[in-house]
Amino acid sequence: MMDQARSAISNLFGGEPLSYTRFSLARQVDGDNSHVEMKLAVDEEENTDNNMKASVRKHRRLNGRLCFGTIAVVIFFLIGFMIGYLGYCKRTEQKDCVRLAETETGNSEIIQEENIPQSSRLYWADLKKLLSEKLDAIEFTDTIKQLSQTSREAGSQKDENLAYYIENQFRDFKLSKVWRDEHYVKIQVKGSAAQNAVTIINVNGDSDLVENPGGYVAYSKATTVSGKLIHANFGTKKDFEDLKYPVNGSLVIVRAGKITFAEKVANAQSFNAIGVLIYMDQTKFPVVEAELSLFGHAHLGTGDPYTPGFPSFNHTQFPPSQSSGLPSIPVQTISRKAAEKLFQNMETNCPPSWNTDSLCKLESSQGINVNLSVNNVLKETRILNIFGVIKGFEEPDRYIVVGAQRDAWGPGAAKSSVGTGLLLKLAQAFSDMVSRGGFKPSRSIIFASWSAGDFGAVGATEWLEGYLSSLHLKAFTYINLDKVVLGTRNFKVSASPLLYTLIEKTMQDVRHPIDGKPLYRDSNWISKVEDLSLDNAAFPFLAYSGIPAVSFWFCENEDYPYLDTNLDTYEKLIQKVPQLNKMVRAAAEVAGQFIIKLTHDIELNLDYDMYNNKILSFVKELNQFRADIKAMGLSLQWLYSARGDFFRATSRLTTDFHNAEKTNRFVVREINNRIMKVEYHFLSPYVSPRESPFRHIFWGSGSHTLTALVENLKLRQKNSSAFNETLFRNQLALATWTIQGVANALSGDIWDIDNEF
């Protein structure tokens, strides 16, 4: 074929043969790959001895041949291309005809596949009904009874066995992934060599043993002290301030309740008491058994107090350290019977305003001292946290965490069995809703079983400390299931303001299982929301990690009397709450609706506008001290500006969401990311997480909080010598900048920030 082409070209140009025509399509050095290079090699036998005139004629003839040769080659190339293209089209047309014929003859499989109806997206009404149906089919009390059979102190073999049981249950539920997380922590237990003891020393120096208590207070200082005994009511700061007797160098006895053991001990220590005894009075805790033992812990914080601010993983090389929240004085729980024996050696009746037992006395009789000996020992133990996840269908890297404490000192029916049983049943129900009910959560749901909750949310806090960077802008809500049923009369809640709107909608949807009325009964319910306490596992999520958290429970007007005792049994719980199954089901419906709304809706159900009210309340409180602030040469103008910028940022975010194209996942995700930043950026960036782990300026603890700022300012009027002006100046400046930082984060990108600061 090449010979024929060469012959044709030769004839075209007057029969003069050319050796070859070569095209080079290689990429040139300058990057132009569209250049076509054509080279003509002439016969080497040409006579090179021609004169100048013949040479000129030959070059002209060669240029003409080059031009005509180029045209000929292009024509041949186009003819070949057209022939090939027409042949390809013919084959394609034949194949299309075959396909058309197959379709016309009725290819039933293809038609059937095209006509499969697509499953429609489930909406809120559908999901609410689906959840209710799943919960109706569950018997909760059998699981609670099973879990309450034995004591399961953190790190014990029984605690570990229960962890493996929960892990296997998660696997049986076919969750997307199940895993465990282990930590090596230090907890305090009663010493085996010597018992803890409370003794009365009379005027003659003789001792009379009051009790070797069955319970104890973890993280108490192990020592022996002796001194006068003074009653300090509940041991609140105000109770100590109202005492007519100085507690300096004395032991104090306080009633259980109202605040945590750790706060009672910290207050006593701040007033220079040398030791603390804690008991349950019959007025507040109407327990028949006067010798009932009580358990608690005295760490003013959460997590392992010997690895503050960092996780307790095995073989970590952190230097020895301990939390500043550990007490430097001994503390011990005693029975009501022991307290009454101590009162027999005391004088002066307790004030009627205390509303306590008639036997209550205020101070030791003349010459009578009390000796307290605590011999607790530290024990390093392995604890297991168990996790299971249902992965989201659109944003699996965004998730909520639903958790419950697993361990308990004693049977722990109300303390941890109800929560653990509820955790298991919710995991089962939601797994079934996804696999069979058509529920497709956009975001993931993590179910977590914590250990060492009795020692200050140790398991939960260590997990947060270990994975804080991984959880940032991924975990956006924590739902706590601990102690959700302690009665039937009231429904109470503690939560981040970001969740208030979600809680209100849920209370309007869920009905009380006894009277059938909605849980929402008071339009002013937000003012009655209780702050998360140190002994609540939701607290470190909010105050340490900046993750919005919620804890809720059904209860009576009085405290449940058996928590943290050996009488926290299934039988006692059923006796107090006869319709336990219905109450747990109602709690499951509350938690279930939280889960659905947080994982299903396009926009995160976090109402950032609620913090406008919190900031405004803080500004109003400071305004009461304008004269004092002005006297120091300071102004609140910058705080007003920061508050205004936050308000404008929230308004702009709301507008951005309303104007956003809801089908554009990238845009919606960007808006949700801005919402997720709100809680986190209320963590003060100006304090060390190790020195002040609870950095949240609203809900944390330390001098960086807004509460501490106001308390310091109040001292200027009450006790000017105790007021620290330098500290106040720093507090005001850093609080202002923290609020401004939240406003900036909420605004979005740096070029979107337009503030007046």
UniProtKB/Swiss-Prot annotation:
Keywords: Cell membrane, Disulfide bond, Endocytosis, Glycoprotein, Lipoprotein, Membrane, Palmitate, Phosphoprotein, Receptor, Signal-anchor, Transmembrane, Transmembrane helix. Residues 220-310 form the PA domain. One of its GO terms (cellular component) is external side of plasma membrane. One of its GO terms (molecular function) is transferrin receptor activity. The chain crosses the membrane at residues 68-88. A motif (Stop-transfer sequence) lies at residues 58-61. It is a single-pass type II membrane protein. Residues 89-757 are extracellular. Stearoylated by ZDHHC6 which inhibits TFRC-mediated activation of the JNK pathway and promotes mitochondrial fragmentation. Stearoylation does not affect iron uptake. N- and O-glycosylated, phosphorylated and palmitoylated. Gene3D superfamilies: 3.50.30.30, Transferrin receptor-like, dimerisation domain, Zn peptidases. A motif (Cell attachment site) lies at residues 643-645. Residues 1-67 are annotated as: Mediates interaction with SH3BP4. It is found in: Cell membrane; Melanosome. Glycans are attached at T103, N248, N314, N719, N724. Belongs to the peptidase M28 family. M28B subfamily. Homodimer; disulfide-linked. Binds one transferrin molecule per subunit. Interacts with SH3BP4. Interacts with STEAP3; facilitates TFRC endocytosis in erythroid precursor cells. This is Transferrin receptor protein 1. It comes from Cricetulus griseus.
